[in-house]
Amino acid sequence: MAVKEILRMGNPQLRKVSNVVDDASDELIISLIKDLQDTVKAHQGAGLAAPQIGVPLRVVLFGGGGPNPRYPEAPSIPQTLLINPVLTPIGSDLEDGWEGCLSVPGLRGKVSRWSRIHYRALNEDGFEVEHCLEGFPARVIQHECDHLDGVLFPDRLVDSASFGFTGELETAGIIEKLSSAEQKASQQSRAD
C-alpha cells in the first residue's frame, strides 16, 4: 500500500488488454485497491486504472468526493472502485470534452464520449453493482475503462489540432486556466 509510479505514454504495458479479476477478495486485489487510492490521491487524478501502475488487471478507481483541482469546472464524483467493469452506452448522444491523463502528463485533448453510460461491475467487497452516469462522471469512467483495453485518450482525439500542452492551450485561451485559489489548493495538496 503505497503511492506507485504511474506509467507514461510510450510504455508498452499501457497498450495491453488487462486480465479479468477472478477473486475480488484476493490479497493482491485488496493491496491493489489501496495502492490505487493512495496513488490517485497523491497525483490529484480524476481516476486511475490498474494498468497505469503496471498491474494488468481490470480494476479502475474514479472520483474522490471533493472538487478536483485538475478539473475545477467539473462536479464532484464520489470515489468509486470497480472490478471487471462492463460499460453500455445509453442512447446515441456523444459529447466532446477536454481530457488529460496521469499517463500523458502535461497534455490535454478534446475527445468525443458517450454522454450517458450504464456500468455493471464488482465493487471492492466483491458484490455486483450497476449504475448510470452522465456528463463528466460518464466521461471519466469511459476514459479509465479505456486503459483496461490498452487505449489512451490521444487515440480518441476529435482531431489532432485539439491536442496540446496544457499551458499552451491555456495561454491561447482554448481551455480555462486554473484560478489562483485552485492553483493554491493544488500546490497545497502536492505538498501534503
Curated annotation (Swiss-Prot):
Free-text remark on how the cofactor is bound: Binds 1 Fe(2+) ion.
Listed EC numbers: 3.5.1.88
InterPro entries named among the record's database cross-references: Peptide_deformylase, Peptide_deformylase_sf
Cofactor(s) the protein needs: Fe(2+)
Gene Ontology MF terms: metal ion binding; peptide deformylase activity
Function per UniProt: Removes the formyl group from the N-terminal Met of newly synthesized proteins. Requires at least a dipeptide for an efficient rate of reaction. N-terminal L-methionine is a prerequisite for activity but the enzyme has broad specificity at other positions.
NCBIfam families: PRK00150.1-3
Name the UniProt record assigns to this protein: Peptide deformylase 1
Annotated source species: Prochlorococcus marinus (strain MIT 9313)
